[in-house]
Amino acid sequence: MVSSVSLFASLTPYLVSALLLFLLLEQLFYRLKKRNLPGPLFVFPIIGNVVALIRDPTSFWDKQSAMADTSVGLSVNYLIGKFIIYIKDAELSNKVFSNIRPDAFQLVGHPFGKKLFGDHSLIFMFGENHKSVRRQVAPNFTRKPLSAYSSLQQIVILRHLRQWEESFSSGSRPVSMRQLIRELNLETSQTVFVGPYLDKEVKNTIRDDYNVFNPGTMALPIDLPGFTFGEARRAVSRLVNTMSLCVRKSKEKMAAGENPTCLVDFWTHSIVAESPPPPHSKDEEISCVLVDFLFASQDASTSSLLWAVVLLESEPEVLRRVREDVARFWSPESKESITADQLAEMKYIRAVAREVLRYRPPASMVPHVAVSDFRLTESYTIPKGTIVFPSLFDASFQGFTEPDRFDPDRFSETRQEDEVFKRNFLTFGIGSHQCVGQRYALNHLVLFIAMFSSMFDFKRVRSDGCDEIVHIPTMSPKDGCTVFLSSRLVTSP
């Protein structure tokens, strides 16, 4: 015992020296990578500024954006051993998106996403593997499948709107729209992706596991039982297993010659027709991509639908024109579905939807990792291993006419600012990893705007800071969009 204490005492100076050397080198390497870019002069050892990020994400990223104004559109920081660069300038963001390749950048979607989502996630693929999966996925978002999805989307949306009408349309008490819309989106995603293979128990399992997973995207990356991140990672594994069962049932159904009725059916229908099956078409591999879709559609759509309600309530003239556009094709009393052709003809509502996505892009940033040193500007080379955060939000307020104004007409056929400033409209990304489901997402937003605005009058409950942005994990209004709802229908549809 005495010898152990003596040994420890003799080693203590060396251990302390090694620790001090490590801390000194950590600061030195940070300063060397930082060079003359704006950012903290010194960072907290090991964890960096992750506590500030977890405590108040909005404030953290606002400060990074403000610092980037003082340079070439870049600022830096340090998070749990990772040097990060925030990219505010739209052209530099385009440069990152256009260089996803083995010797430049890899999309990570989340600073610790690979550990959270798993190796088979489409997010982390590039090269031939990524092209192979995209070739399988892309046909599932063409006109015929989208038309089938639209019918399913409307059934779910209308069912939830009727429930809201029964519960809240008296207008006697306000309701926070966030949870209502979140539940609507989760059921819509489940129904469109794997609907025929879900019973009530499986739906509840997916909902519960997703609710465990979601907080993990905003937690410290401690992968241990009882910690939010660790529980989230295990929830992803359970979601993949659940989706794998649906994929297997779909393959059996398509092999029997039945017609596809949901996304996984359209996908497996083409797979069973090939012999041998294409690469990356195993049950687990397909289910991993379906979980990616679930994450993308759930939180991103919740954000966009919430902001649609917020912005329509604050813009009465826009809301009036939306209702006029809907009335040309559809009425809740008609008990008819909106057809694919009618959906395409709702041009003003589509402009409103696109402006919602520009004004408040659901994912404010899309993290990438530098696979090797990359010369971003004439004066700065991004070091290998750096996590870069191109800001879609900041890009949306560059170039456009009066960018701080909510103006759907900028997307009209006359002005076409989406084409004129397409390098600034990055909500769905660009390049090889551009969102494959963007037409589906836009249709979902258009359908919700059309149906919700036709069925309800809504009045926002104003409070201090209600319009402030919070990241949970996508951008949402701070108050969850609290409104009074009242039915516009004489009788229930």
Swiss-Prot record:
Cofactor(s) listed: heme
Transmembrane portions of the chain: 5-25
Residue sites binding heme per the record: C435
EC number: 1.14.19.41
Reactions accelerated catalytically: 5-dehydroepisterol + NADPH + O2 + H(+) = ergosta-5,7,22,24(28)-tetraen-3beta-ol + NADP(+) + 2 H2O
Gene3D superfamilies in the record: Cytochrome P450 (1.10.630.10)
InterPro entries documented for this protein: Cyt_P450, Cyt_P450_CS, Cyt_P450_E_grp-I, Cyt_P450_sf
Topology term for the membrane: Single-pass membrane protein
Tissue: Expressed in stems. Detected in primary root caps and immature petals.
Top EC class for this record: oxidoreductase
Record keyword Iron present: yes
Entry GO MF terms: C-22 sterol desaturase (NADPH) activity; heme binding; iron ion binding; monooxygenase activity
First and last residue of the signal peptide: none
Subcellular location: Membrane
Main location: membrane
GO biological process entries: sterol biosynthetic process
GO CC, one annotated term: membrane
Key words of the record: Heme, Iron, Lipid biosynthesis, Lipid metabolism, Membrane, Metal-binding, Monooxygenase, NADP, Oxidoreductase, Steroid biosynthesis, Steroid metabolism, Sterol biosynthesis, Sterol metabolism, Transmembrane, Transmembrane helix
Pfam annotation, one family: p450
Alphabetical list of PANTHER family matching this protein: C-22 STEROL DESATURASE ERG5, CYTOCHROME P450 26
Family the entry assigns: Belongs to the cytochrome P450 family.
This protein's name: Cytochrome P450 710A3
UniProt organism field: Arabidopsis thaliana (Mouse-ear cress)
